[in-house]
Amino acid sequence: MSKRNNVSYVKPAEPSFISKFKKDVCYKEGPTVDTKRQELPILSEDSDGSDKEDEQPQVVVLRKGDLSEEDVMKIKQQIKENTKDEEAAPSDGKILFKKPVKRLSGDTTSGVNACSTKKKKQEDTKESSGTKSSQKQVKNSSLLSFDDEDYDD
């Protein structure tokens, strides 16, 4: 058993023709086991996920009433403050659940009632075709049955 603990791998020397070929081709050595075990340096980025200055969108003001860059920065700051206030956990550590606001039946149907005339026409045609197809099925069922004796019982 002690022989197993002393086993190690020794990488043989690379032949000269292979090293010459790699040099001619400009071969770059791939990652090895040791390089994969190395820890990557941690990037020092903001943890809040904010964009860097050069990655932020460019603000173009066309009219007097448009938002300026300063206004956008103020709004972003207010949003960050609001989210921090909402995310703050209670001091006693208990999680509190809020009851959802009940919706009135009129509120949910008010947006759904706005329907185009094209959709109404399609629904009407579907209903009329549904009655016609049921009549056709009755006629076809008598024509297509092969065992009339089984159904006459």
Swiss-Prot record:
This is Uncharacterized protein KIAA1143 homolog. It comes from Xenopus laevis (African clawed frog). Residues 106-116, 130-144 have a biased composition (Polar residues). InterPro entries: DUF4604, KIAA1143-like. Residues 45-56 have a biased composition (Acidic residues). Residues 30-66, 79-153 are annotated as: Disordered. Pfam families: DUF4604. It comes from the Eukaryota.
